[in-house]
Structure formats: structure tokens, C-alpha cells
Amino acid sequence: MSRRHKAERREVIPDAKFGNIIVSRFMNSIMRDGKKSVAESIVYGALDVVEAKAKSNPLDLFVTALENVAPAVEVRSRRVGGATYQVPVEVRTERRQTLAIRWLIASARARNEKTMVERLSAELLDAANNRGNAVKKREDTHRMAEANRAFSHYRW
């Protein structure tokens, strides 16, 4: 691995409907095989369903759902003298957002509703109300960090 240059982060263009960078990143994560228009229709469709069901601003609800799923701490493996410890570390803002997006999408894909629009909208509503698999994933991560608090002095 070359240490000469830092990897340059690509600029994400805000989405067309809301003009929001987070929605755009979410869309890019949903996208498979470069099919952006399909991802767009899924995300916008899900946000329309959310708006109809919750009768509130879908963007606010989306941001709330992301905040409820984003982890504050996680565990990272650290090898010390032949033993591997799970060391709890704080999560950087960028990674918090990335993990929240990843977990929301994974939880939505694992649901049983018929279409992805239905699955995603249901998961977003659940996450906004602190329920669902994505929130459970965050709770598990926090529980893991809490259980390994004794090793927090190994932080780097």
C-alpha cells in the first residue's frame, strides 16, 4: 500500500428533487450495476410512501432515521502480545453516516415486503421511530463496545 498520497474523496452532487447530498449518497449506495435511474425511482418512491404514511416532511424523517441508526462507538480489533482485543473507539462523522446508510439498506433488503420501495419505506419509518433491524444493529454495536470497555485503554 502506497503511503505517498492520500486517497482523494470524490465530490457527491446533490440529488435533483431535494438538493441534498445525503440523499444522493443514499441513492448511490442503493444503486446496483450502475443503474442510477432505478435507484432514483426506489429512493424517491420510498420517500413518497413515507410522506403519505407519516404525513410529514420526508426529508426530515429520512434524516431522523439516519441519526437513529448512526453508531457513536464501535469495536476494532487490536493485537497486543498474541491476544486480539476488541477495542471500543468513537466513530468519525463520515463513517457514522456511511454505516447508517449501509445498515438501513441492508435491513431494507432483508425485509419481506414485495417491492424494494415498500421495504425501504417501512425500514425508514421503523428507524425514525427507533425500531427495526437497522436500529437493532446499532444497539448491538453499542452493546459490544460497552462489553469491551475494559480494553478502551488500548485505543490508538
UniProtKB/Swiss-Prot annotation:
The lineage of its organism: Bacteria, Pseudomonadati, Pseudomonadota, Alphaproteobacteria, Hyphomicrobiales. PROSITE patterns: RIBOSOMAL_S7. One of its GO terms (cellular component) is small ribosomal subunit. InterPro entries: Ribosomal_uS7 (IPR000235), Ribosomal_uS7_bac/org-type (IPR005717), Ribosomal_uS7_CS (IPR020606), Ribosomal_uS7_dom (IPR023798), Ribosomal_uS7_dom_sf (IPR036823). Belongs to the universal ribosomal protein uS7 family. Transmembrane segments: none annotated. GO terms for molecular function: rRNA binding; structural constituent of ribosome; tRNA binding. NCBIfam families: rpsG_bact (TIGR01029). GO terms for biological process: translation. It comes from the Bacteria. Part of the 30S ribosomal subunit. Contacts proteins S9 and S11. The keyword Isomerase does not apply. The gene is rpsG. This is Small ribosomal subunit protein uS7. The keyword Phosphoprotein does not apply. It comes from Azorhizobium caulinodans (strain ATCC 43989 / DSM 5975 / JCM 20966 / LMG 6465 / NBRC 14845 / NCIMB 13405 / ORS 571). Keywords: Ribonucleoprotein, Ribosomal protein, RNA-binding, rRNA-binding, tRNA-binding. One of the primary rRNA binding proteins, it binds directly to 16S rRNA where it nucleates assembly of the head domain of the 30S subunit. Is located at the subunit interface close to the decoding center, probably blocks exit of the E-site tRNA.
